[in-house]
Amino acid sequence: AIVGYHTYPHIDLFETGCKAARLMLRILSGDVAPSMAFRKIPMIVPAENMQTTSGPFGRLMDVAEAFERTSHSEAVSIFGVQPWLDIPEMGCSVVVVTNGNGAAAEAQASGLANAFWKSRHEFDVDLVPAERAIREALREEGGPVVLSESSDSTGSGSPGDSTGVLRPLLEAQLHEPAAIFLVDPVAVQVAHKAGVGSTVLMKIGGRFDRLNSRPVPVKARVRLLADGRWTPMGRGYNTGIETCMGRSAVLEVGQVRILTAERSAMTVDPELFRSHGIEPAHMKIVVVKSPNGFRALYEPLAKKIILVDTPGVSSANLASLPYRRVPRPIYPLDAGVRYSAPVQSEANRRSMRSRA
């Protein structure tokens, strides 16, 4: 049996683990004879609009939970897929597990898959160029305004070294503070060698993804040096577990605080900045390198959230990604894709024929 999360951002890790464990024990005791139905949908959707608190994915998950409550389904899972993967198995999917009722599993899986497919256009996102996003943020009364640089999402496989937002942020010559995270081991080494309070001249960022980003020359003051150890405190991702991103440093260029680290780190928890003396609630602009996972902890803080359009290997602009291995045709990469979920899966048809 497969049991998936019901929240994105994933704040139900513990609950899902308990649910899976209980189901496993019931299977082992003979109380449940799992019957499972699977539907693969020829579709990729951007992660930026897959939150379950609202929107199309939230509505689909409401249906899944209703099935679990009212139709005796053991587990109903909807998988929105990691859109940046270039694999032959690519595509959104639905899995339904029932207690021996194969027909119900098949019907629910097909119904959810068709509903998922029909809502595909609702997952489209409006991305804002970085320069315009910064101007919009500065026009807002108060803050913080959170800029999501999802194309460089450290939780999506990107290196975290993009200067796509950093460069225009520095060029804007802000009068109010801003914070951004950047992976740059060379900059950290320079900062640690210079010491706190020193002024350093260097090029920062663009160390790894040189196709999509270029280093930015800066004159920065070393505000803080640390060992890069910090503990996420918010519900969801590695709560209470100390993580280490190598040595770290906070560089100050005008009003911009650049938290640099030798290794990557998830940016979904404000504690990343707080552990380095930066309070996100006091910033005018906070840049997170995450498509959606940040919402659980940043939405209560944010005056506004803007999805920024910058080049990168985890871009929401799916047409810009160099897919080579995904099955074709697939939405939205190809025009005229059609889909209707089968009433019964091929595997179950073969199983029924073998029993006949």
Residue ranges and their predicted role:
Residues 94, 114-117, 229-356:
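Extended hydrophobic packing segments that form well-structured cores
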Residues 32-36, 45-132, 139:
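Accessory alpha-helical/coil subdomains and C-terminal extensions
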Residues 49-56, 136-138, 154-166, 191-196:
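Short glycine/threonine-rich loop-to-helix capping motif typified by GTGT followed
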Residues 99-102, 151-154, 184-187, 256, ...:
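Short, glycine-/Ser/Thr-/acidic-enriched flexible segments
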Residues 185-231, 306-313:
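Acidic, Ser/Thr-rich peripheral helices and adjacent loops at domain boundaries
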Residues 7, 22-33, 62-73, 99, ...:
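Generic secondary-structure signature for well-ordered alpha-helical cores
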Residues 1-33, 144, 149-166, 170, ...:
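Active-site histidine-anchored catalytic micro-motif
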Residues 139, 144-145, 152-155, 238-239, ...:
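Non-transmembrane, aqueous-exposed alpha-helical and coiled segments at domain scale
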